[in-house]
Amino acid sequence: MTSSKPKKTSRVRKTTKNSKKNNPVTMPVLPKTPPSFKNKVVDKKALKNLVSWAYKTHGTAITSAMADNLKDLGFKYATQAAVSISVDDLKVPEAKQDLIGQAEEQISATEECYRLGEITEVERHTKVIDTWTETNERLVDAVKNNFNQNDPLNSVWMMANSGARGNMSQVRQLVGMRGLMANPQGEIIDLPIRTNFREGLTVTEYVISSYGARKGLVDTALRTADSGYLTRRLVDVAQDVIVREEDCGTELSIVVEAEDGKFGARLLGRLTAEDIFDAEENIVVSQNTAIDPSLSEEIEKASINKVKIRSPLTCEANRSVCRRCYGWALAHNHLVDLGEAVGIIAAQSIGEPGTQLTMRTFHTGGVSTAESGVVRSRISGKVEFSSKAKVRGYRTPHGVEAKQAEVDFTLKIVPQSNNSGKAQKIEVSSGSLLFVDDGEEINSDITVAQITAGAVKKSVEKATKDVICDLAGQVRYDKVIQPKEVTDRQGNITLKAQRLGRLWVLAGDVYNLPPNARPVISSGKNVDEGTVLAEASQSSEFGGQVRLRESIGDSREVQIVTTSMSLTNFKLIEESTHSGQIYNLESSDGTSYRLNISPGSKINSGEVIADLTDERFRTKTGGLIKYAPGLSVKKARSSKNGFEVSQGGTLLWIPQETHEINKDISLLMIEDMKWIEAGTEVVKDIFSQTSGIVTVTQKNDILREITVRNGNFYECDDEEVLNRFTEEGNLVNPGEKILDGVDNTEILFVQKLETSKCRGLLLRTVEEFTIPDQAELPQLSHVKQEKGPHLGLKAIQRLTYKDGELIKSVEGVELLRTHLSIESFDATPQMTIDVESIKDDKDESINRLNLVILESILVRRDTVSDASHGSTHTELQVNNNQLVKAGDVIATTQILCKEKGLVQLPNVVDDEPIRRLIVEREQDKIKVKISDKAVVKVGDRVVDGDPITKTVKSTSCGEIEEISNSSVTLRLGRPYMVSPDSVLHVKDGDLVLRGDGLALLVFERQKTGDIVQGLPRIEELLEARRPRDSATLCKKSGIVQIKKGNDEESVSLSVIEKDDLVNEYQLLIGKNIMVSDGQQVTGGESLTDGPINPHELLDCYFNDLKDQKPLIDAARESISKLQRSMVSEVQNVYKSQGVAIDDKHIEVIVRQMTSKVRIEDAGDTTLLPGELIELRQVEDTNQAMAITGGAPAEFTPVLLGITKASLNTDSFISAASFQETTRVLTEAAIEGKSDWLRGLKENVIIGRLIPAGTGFSGFVEELSSEAGPHPDILAEESGGYRRAQNLRPDYTVDMPQSPAVSSTAILDDPSDEDLETTRNRHGIDPSSSNFAAFARPNAENQFSEDQLPDPAALEGLQEEGLLSDE
């Protein structure tokens, strides 16, 4: 953070100008004399200055002693004064009631304007909020004055005023008013809290207040995290910026311009880049002098407006900043020390205020504030604009017609002759709003102007607000609105207003018509109460027999029997069981069906209604099922119902009894593979049902299953016989030979059995079941009708199990089921079938089953009228049991008129049905009596106060309907102002009810000036994000040409560049053009409004400059232009929050963001296209190419956001410890990168001493020892001479043989000491070394055989320019 300025004291300048010249970096000596005694109150600021003076003059020890003494002094007097705070100290200023009264008057006036349609809903909201904000500001002044005049020693006032604790914003809430609050979405609630905490809040206010307080807390939590992350990224990008050099010797500099002749703190601690002369050509400050406050004042006194200073942005030190470019270290106001980690200091200086700014909302408890420079007149008098004033009409956000200044000028209020006093001067900046006209006479305390602050760029956002209708009626547009249909990308058509205008709703009684109602009356008819306005009819779809039901609720049901089917050859028999009623169908031949449904239920088509109760297909036990050839089923199995039989045949059944047991083996009571009789106990309490051979399945001494298979067992050892059969079993037809001595006269199922004792075959009997092709059903019914749905019954046979399935069971199972299912044809899916039980026609004692399809029609009851519907009357047009045809009307509903009046129908579009109509009643009109001629005509729309005749004014809003000699009839209405670009939800002539949406107002609103918008903005700048809807920038300098298109909207903009090239720019709809026709523009200038895309800006600067200058200069200059704009943008955000950060910190960060260029074309260099590399490095490479005559590399400058810059640093350890660790390390490994451990982070991770502070000197020694005999290698890029090994193998540069070049390439021979240290470091014995570079050739020691030079190494050293060709 910047230190506050030392207190201005009389300075003793000891150094003379001459001595400064000789010794470039002298520090002006600070006065040792203390500031003179001042007899006035010392507040927080004065204390700050005192302590800072002591620290800068006398160092830490003395300052801390002084601070201690100050503390004792403070406590001593605080104890004696016994200051405390009680509730009585909170004094509410008397002016509060008046101020709130004034505000309420203004607001009711605003509401009235809104009611008259003079301002839009948005303007009303804005005006209300601004009125309260302004009242709040005035109340703060009242609080200050009240305390100052009436009670200057009030303890609350002393506390806030001295800076001990609290601030005016908090005191205002205690004794003024709490003010406006924001809701959780950040929108301001237009109901302010008028009370303060001293008076206490009402319940509503309390709830709203806690809303805002909650938002403050939540915001704080979120912002703290954001701010911390921002600091982390900043530290990461700048951690390796350390002051490593005394002076980089650059000749570049940046220019600082004075604002209003003042430099403020912007020159403090910087070194001048050149001598500064005053108007008489005397040197004011010589080159490389640090500027202290007194020098800064001298420069201002000499009215010098531009000063060139050295800056980290232009420092040419390699990978660091030199002392002179950085200037003072702001901790002690002396030149920065070598080894100072200025990057980290910069990162913390920018990141730390983020957290503070967060606290901003927190301390004011979420109360919203907004800054506006409203100027009020202090005297009454006449307004005079200066001669150069230029103004144009402007509608303010409050809907007030005002003037906007186009240029800066001065406005005077000259007092009237009788009132002697000084004229009031107001400096008006361009863009400010003026509420008075030139020459107008005004009173004192009138709002004259609203001056815009240039520096603060308030961010605006697009927002929308709905306009809701307050009364029912008919919509009319004013002509000025000029609605236009706009089609968006999805093809949706919306209606938009093009101009500011009113949308009227003219009163009337609007009726909603039911969906199928049609008006039976024509437009313009007079109607009485009870007249039928519209009729709706309900008709039958299919026709049939009518059944009238009892009424239910508010509607009656009419049923029409479309189809009915009675099962006349079945009796319906009801049985009662303990689980409920069961119904059976019995036919005359004795077959019986069990019904699955009960009368009174509804079923769908295809449902099974009954099952045949058939014992023929029931088995006694479980077993194995086989389909004999010829029996086929449909593939699909419905899991519940089994397989449908498509062709009858024989079903084979091999019974076997299976007991599933899961008990201990000790309970087994029989032996495996033994024959048992029916009734044998196999396991305790489990008995066999059949006789046969028993098989036991066990696992881990647990009995799993016991199977009993009937049949005869024959022992057999003949392999050939046994191999014919399997353990699963085979079917054997009658007459086939199985074993000698066994005759088979029927189908048998033969299984091979092997036990420990014997082997053999088990012959099992097979039961056969015959299945018919069709289910035997008594007469199947089918009912057919000419039109509409009909019904049929169908019998389906389904097999329960699939072929080869083993059914493990003791009880029997049903193998085949016969279902009765109902089918309906031509019915709609939502039609259900009703099941009914009816008495037989001939014999009342017999019940029959009846299936019907019903069409049900709900007929409305009569209703009494309500707000949106007229009363209705419904009549049935049919009787019970009547037969009706399809399309016959069953009932009609009439909509009746509520009150007498005039009917109007809306305009019909494309045969759309009419859904609403309106009746204009007597109470929707008023008559105004007139005596003289009317000044209005029929169809005019007037609001309160508009003249109807010269003497009579209108008392309400509405449209003139008729004018007679004695009166004017006005149809009441309500105007709504809509702004341009609003979306209209209704068309001209539409009918609306109260609460309908009329339009969506689109407007730009300022976001509350809170770091909530500050932090993201800083992040956006430092991450170099591409903003949405960015401004169109001029690519190259030239002259603007603007052409209007055919319609008013479209405009084409082109720039005529030099060589008469015309460059046309595509303009997006809704963008405002910021330049005028014929204006001269430079590359990078904004042509339209909107946020600027920094990447595009850099490209524009570079493309514009590279035609005029060499590539490297163009890159330098374009980067420097971008850097300046970035620094000022970041500063603007912080300044708007009242935070002071020294420019140099931001410069250090911006320097890191702009240090790289992207190679576009490598030329003959070893660089790769697309590689990101430092500008200085490319410059060196290209200089080498210029010497060797190769093609230089071409490049474009790039701007990297802080995250991207961190990931692109030379150190892969630092990058990997920041983000995307895996990717960074993988790439580094593949590319074979080396990390030279230059920054702080890498060294911390490796665990070495960091190369800053006290570790700096060791680092320098290590670097120089690493360079060995060639210290200039330190200036080389990170690879050093190892880069020679990375050259592409197929790559050679032919060195031109001119002697001039080779002579420049010869280096001074290293001294003997250099060679010695290098040999020692690498442990090289000169006698045994065969590497020529480490031995000095002399007369005896020519390149002898044993000292063969390594050709690759020599070539590498030559290419690096470390060895000459000779």
UniProtKB/Swiss-Prot annotation:
Gene Ontology MF annotations: DNA binding; DNA-directed RNA polymerase activity; zinc ion binding
Region called Disordered, residue ranges: 1-37, 1292-1366
The EC number(s) this enzyme carries: 2.7.7.6
Keyword check for Nucleotidyltransferase: yes
Compositionally biased region (Low complexity): 1354-1366
Cofactor entry: Zn(2+)
Coiled-coil blocks: none
Catalytic activity line of the entry: RNA(n) + a ribonucleoside 5'-triphosphate = RNA(n+1) + diphosphate
GO cellular component, one term: DNA-directed RNA polymerase complex
Cofactor note: Binds 1 Zn(2+) ion per subunit.
Entry binding sites for Zn(2+): 248, 315, 322, 325
UniProt biased composition (Basic residues): 1-20
A Pfam family that the UniProt record links to this protein: RNA_pol_Rpb1_3
Family affiliation: Belongs to the RNA polymerase beta' chain family. RpoC2 subfamily.
Function: DNA-dependent RNA polymerase catalyzes the transcription of DNA into RNA using the four ribonucleoside triphosphates as substrates.
HAMAP family in UniProt: RNApol_bact_RpoC2 (MF_01324)
Assembly notes: In cyanobacteria the RNAP catalytic core is composed of 2 alpha, 1 beta, 1 beta', 1 gamma and 1 omega subunit. When a sigma factor is associated with the core the holoenzyme is formed, which can initiate transcription.
NCBIfam families cross-referenced by the UniProt entry: PRK02597.1, rpoC2_cyan
Protein name: DNA-directed RNA polymerase subunit beta'
Organism: Prochlorococcus marinus (strain MIT 9215)
